[in-house]
Amino acid sequence: VSQPDSTSAPVADCYDLVVIGGGINGVGIAADAAGRGLKVFLCEKDDLARHTSSASSKLIHGGLRYLEHYEFRLVREALAEREVLLAKAPHIVKPMRFVLPHRPHLRPAWMIRAGLFLYDHMGKRKRLGASRSLRFGAGSALKPAITRGFEYADCWVDDARLVVLNAMAAREHGAHIHTQTLCLGAKRVGALWEVEVQHADGSTRTVRAKGLVNAAGPWVAQFIKNDLKLDAPYGIRLIQGSHLIVPRLYEGEHAYILQNEDQRIVFCIPYLDRFTLIGTTDREYTGDPAKVAITDQETDYLLNVVNAHFNHQLQRSDIFSTYAGVRPLCNDESDNPSAVTRDYTLALSAAHGEAPLLSVFGGKLTTYRKLAESAMAELKPFFSQMGGSWTAESTLPGGEDMTTPQALEEALLARHTWLAPAIAQRWARTYGSRVWTLLAGVEGPQDLGQAIGAGLFAREVDYLREHEWATSLEDILWRRTKLGLFTTEAEQNTLSQYLEKATQRSHAA
């Protein structure tokens, strides 16, 4: 099976834009630019969504707590984006109700009501319901002392798949997407950038471009200093956010937003039917962003917040898995990590006649599409042929010809009556209408190939290698699917062996 776009562009080809970074902002900009007719080359040193973009709380949300920091522009933009992304990717984005237990000594009821009133009215709502007050009865999962609360709507998203789908959209508009490709350095030569990149096999090439976008996330400032030999216009603050995954903590498909004594909030979110996701933390991080991991202090912090609210008391032994990431936020000199702005800053540098450099500082998953539109507005003076904005009305791959995941699931089971319902459900919520590409030519279970485990078959692995840049076990089990939580060590070994053979076959071909 060939890797998509691994060697599709000749050496020293000239592009309009080279994008550094395969996180949500990089692929969002690549897709937007390619759809406007620009010729785009994106390189990512690891896998798509390998770092910050797969370590989020997996929410598309307005950011209720940002209202306390008066970030009205960010909240308004984020609220509006919820409905846009629901329509763009109905297979991986879903509405979710959030329950906020009232703790009067932390925030008075009038303050929460005022915040929710703004939340309801600042963004256009079509599918998302309004907020309301709640009273908790005897059957509540919360402690008896917590009798009142509030409920409002936001959305959940599969964060890593949002990145992959944007990369696919970019490719379908002509962009060249190269994973496992490190940028060794770049320099301005006349009116162009010359960018040297190194592929996974060690081979190097030079790519020329009229513009360079630095969307390196946690490495954005480091890239400017070390690889471009320039001065970074802003400092970056790395704020670590860690999460726990525990067995399902309560019944229902709603999330909880818990207020802690330190004025921070922590989410408890239903995850993959069997689990509850708990997070996040906020702590300054000064190490290598690639090596971030949850600390004992963070683990205790999250357990304590949850145990202060729920009847069911969690212990360390209940933790099924953890993950951590760093948010690369623009340094606004705030003393409190929680108060550092989540808004984005775009820094354009281009003296007269120079090829432009656009660097992305900060940003959040929810507003990636608006960030990309803003990036295009910054670059417009350098690309007179650039088309207009288009991403608000377009679906992401898999969102085409789709009403709901449930309807797609039913169509899958009607056409393939032998298919296990759990697999049909997972495929509908993972691939959307692209599941028909995955199943092209499949008449019966024998056509799915080798059974690897947890509902994963060779056919799906081949699809992910061919269409979604997946090369490793981790790419497949943790980012393209979430089957890492459901597979045994033996099943993971089976997958590793299958991938090894598949790689050998593709090299032989």
What kind of region is each of these model predictions?
Residues 179-193:
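A conserved short coil-to-beta-strand element within the FAD-binding core of flavoproteins
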Residues 214-229:
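Flavin (primarily FAD) binding-site architecture
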Residues 153, 159-162, 169, 228-277, ...:
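C-terminal catalytic lobe of FAD-dependent flavoproteins
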Residues 13-15, 202-211:
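Core beta-strand elements of the Rossmann-like FAD/NAD(P) dinucleotide-binding domain
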Residues 58-139:
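Dinucleotide-binding Rossmann-like beta1-alpha1 core, especially the glycine-rich loop
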Residues 34-55:
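Glycine-rich FAD pyrophosphate-binding loop
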Residues 1-17, 32-36:
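Extreme N-terminal leader/targeting segments of oxidoreductases
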Residues 21-23, 45:
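Glycine-rich Rossmann-fold phosphate-binding loop(s) that bind the pyrophosphate
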